[in-house]
Amino acid sequence: TQMGFLELLYMSDEESVLKSEVANKLNLTKTSITRATAQLEEMGLIQQMKSGTEIAIKRNYSRKEYYENAKGYLINPVQKVITIMRYEATFESFSAGETALSQESELNPPRIEERAIYKGEEVVDQLEIVDARSEDPDDCLKIQLWKYNPSYFAREGCVNPVSLACTFKGNEDERIEMSIEKLLEEL
């Protein structure tokens, strides 16, 4: 559902899209996209319209209102965080966590760079997990394993702002909260 939400979030206002196109783009089954759009419609966030034999969907709100109305339902996409040696990172990954936030705000970057990949990537099983406390932080990378593929909505090598904000759910750090507010002002 969150992937469907994000796909519509990043479209322009008033734009509609065929449900089948969203399913293809995001690699979702017909069942998954049907369930997702039904949930979004139930929440009053989108409408579904018949378009010939297809069904088109569009947001009921401007981008900002759409996000505001949904943010209570959005989940943290991070399943698990692992630490690996930097030289192992030969796969495509996206700037995430405090690393991504520091690129968009005044926040200082974390001691160990944070990146995101989809938990279902084949490479995940081959990664050797290390204990960051016994390694030089400069040689380490923190890898967030995401529940959905961050590549679908990534921009300029960085995870998308709304998903990034979701990764900090429950974080009490004021500097982070302020940086996220600033980041989301541009929605």
Language model segments and positions:
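Short amphipathic alpha-helical interface segments
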Residues: 2-15
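Short acidic, hydrophobic short linear motifs in intrinsically disordered regions
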Residues: 13-26, 37
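Short, structured loop/turn "capping" segments at alpha-beta junctions
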Residues: 15-17, 32-33, 47
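Short amphipathic alpha-helical interaction segments
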Residues: 27-42
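A short, conserved structural fragment
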Residues: 41-52
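Minor-groove-contacting beta-hairpin "wing" of winged helix-turn-helix DNA-binding domains
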Residues: 53-61
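Long, low-complexity, charge-rich intrinsically disordered regions
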Residues: 71-187
